[in-house]
Amino acid sequence: MSVEEKARIGNSEEPIIIETGKYAKLTDGSVVVRQGGTAVLVTAVMSDEPITDVDFTPLAVDYRERASAYGRIPGGFTKREGKPTDREILVSRVIDRPIRPLFPEGFFHDVIITALTLSADDKYDPDVLAITGASAALHISRIPFEGPIAGVRVCRVNGEFVANPTYEQRKEADLDIVMAGTKDAIVMVEGGGKEIPEEVLADALFFGLDAIKEVIEAQERLREKVGKPKFEYQKVELPEDILKALEEECTPKILEAFNIKDKKERYSTLDKIVEEFIEAHQIPEELHFAVKYFYKKLESRLMREKVLKEGVRIDGRKPNEIRPIWIEVHPFERPHGNAIFTRGQTQAYVTVTLGTPDEALIIETIAEGEVFKRFMLHYSMPPFSVGEAKPWGPPRRREIGHGALAERAIEPLLPPEEEYPFIIRVVSDILESNGSTSMATVCGASLALFDAGVPMKDNKHVAGIAMGLILEKDRYVILSDILGDEDHLGDMDFKVAGTKDGITSVQMDIKVKGITKEIMLDALKQAREGRLYILEKMYEAIPEPRKEPHPYTPKVEVVDVPEEKAPLIIGPGGSTVKKIYDETGVKVWVGEQGKVYLFVFPGGDVEKAKQMIQDIVREVEVGAVYKGTITRVEPYGVFVELWPGKIGLLHVSKMAEPVRSATEKYKVGEEIIVKVLDLDELGRPRFTTIGIEDVGTEKKEVKPKVGDVYEGKVVRVEPYGAFIEYAPGKVGLLHVSKMKERVKDARQKYKVGDVVKVKVVEIDEQGRPKFTDDV
């Protein structure tokens, strides 16, 4: 039986429709969520048996977009979808993050969420529909789930908040965030803006929370109609006497270990405490997992109490205290820009590489087809950064997500493409990790961009900070610059990046209900204070983008040419720009409105490249006579270069001495004097040798007149007439009809080499004389 529920989502143009009972019925729960012409199928499946030796819910989320949903055929050789794209991975993460904290403690069954885009229009993005679909599928299923939640995108367009805006509205927005929440609490935020004030972000979040209420109510109604009884899972249990002994014996040791500032030493000590307890009490092997599970819960509770009661954190810092910062700009010679940013035991080495427009990242997206990215930020966290002896594999989902977060933070400050045409690639390699590596990446990227001389907007640095929260009933403490432990054991992970003037990127995961607007504003205020402190340190290290780049950093110069002549610089198949690069080492990119960009790498001769471009666009005068060099010979004509880059065609029909094939008379490398007849549609000259005379290096034009008499030589004979060379390089036709002695075939009277006296009786439209031998 098919059942559907409909709900408005804030001030969005069209309602949300949630349908179940028609598709994918063998799953534990499945729904189709629609808005406009966009539809997403979301399924939830759970394993019957729990996974052993894990202390978390083994959740996996897989979001996929089919090209058919957009009416497209995938590109590539196979013409089928392949491994998940970055876009699919990022959407999978925003589905995963809000639902993961809502599985009950001790639930260790495999849960697989799959979202498949069935249809996609040109108005609504499927991503937020997939978040709502994941919640609805779980809510109506047997799978234990403390939802429902709903997803919404909030944008600010012309100063007004819009829920689930269209693609066109998003283009005009200065704030674009995806968020998810329960009926009364925000649980996840992901997005960014153009230096947005903290108060505006807070207002947007609570606008979004209000917008999703009807969608959550629709899910409740759906469960009332078709919901399955929830699965009774086996909870983790431990005998009371062991649990009591664990708390009494381990509490003082854990508190003492919290005072150890070094991460590796603290982790090792905490692990040793529980191992010694198990050994001392001879705990049976089947209870080892339960002991460690409750030990972790004890560790979390003690850490939280220490912060709430004493205002002191694991490493001894105050709640708003930031770890010591150490910065090194351009530590290594060859990268175009590079910097080390260290905060406590978190360290990022960030490089900037500048490239030419042909090195842009081309992404085939399902919605938009090919997209060219001029800015890329890639984040990498090798195992050695946490002291693990593991091989370094390909990027994982977490790394792709962290890179996207940092990329979003930096991008609004980049110079416009027309002012700074370089392709920019930033790479962050995490060398040490103890929390907040994505925010260290933001800081390191900003420093490295300054080092590379990238003219960031208003010379502004971008800094990031990760905030945490400990919340117990009516007490809460906000933590600045959190450690890895505080992330895992706290109630909120709130990453904020931006400039001194506002927020450019935000990511928030909240594990508890009850985050009020007051708490949110306090967290944003404390984050701003921390961000300003970090920015101060960054400006001390490098106050503005370098005016003079390093020796190995490429430079760019701009040459303006007439827009209609720009294709000449490219040349057929890019041959001209390739020639310039081969001869000068300068890469040429032809932009819009006659802008030609010269990318100068070490060893490049930019002055020579400029001269070559000036020669290419230099005007030739129609009717003028020039000396050139033959660069290519074809049967139909020869290509003559007047100066570097200025090449035109001398067609056989425009030659003073008619020939069947130009290869009979001309060779590559020969000099030739030509007259410009006209220009083709691309501005390339077309030549003739008719009516000009080569006298040494002088260019003397000869114009025969009717009545002139010449003594010439026969250079070619055809049945219809003889071609007479009446002066060096100048030929005219003696037609059989103009011969004094009438013949049917000129070959009956003349042969090549004969000397004949002729008179001009006519000048054709191309300036060539026609003769008679009746003199």
UniProtKB/Swiss-Prot annotation:
GO biological process, one term: RNA catabolic process
Main EC class the enzyme belongs to: transferase
Keyword Transferase among record annotations: yes
Keyword flag RNA-binding: yes
Pfam families, per database record: KH_1, PNPase, RNase_PH, RNase_PH_C, S1
The protein's Enzyme Commission number: 2.7.7.8
Catalysed reaction, written as an equation: RNA(n+1) + phosphate = RNA(n) + a ribonucleoside 5'-diphosphate
Main location: cytoplasm
Transmembrane portions of the chain: none
Domain S1 motif: 623-693, 707-775
Role, per record: Involved in mRNA degradation. Catalyzes the phosphorolysis of single-stranded polyribonucleotides processively in the 3'- to 5'-direction.
Family per similarity comment: Belongs to the polyribonucleotide nucleotidyltransferase family.
Protein name (Swiss-Prot/TrEMBL): Polyribonucleotide nucleotidyltransferase
Originating organism: Aquifex aeolicus (strain VF5)
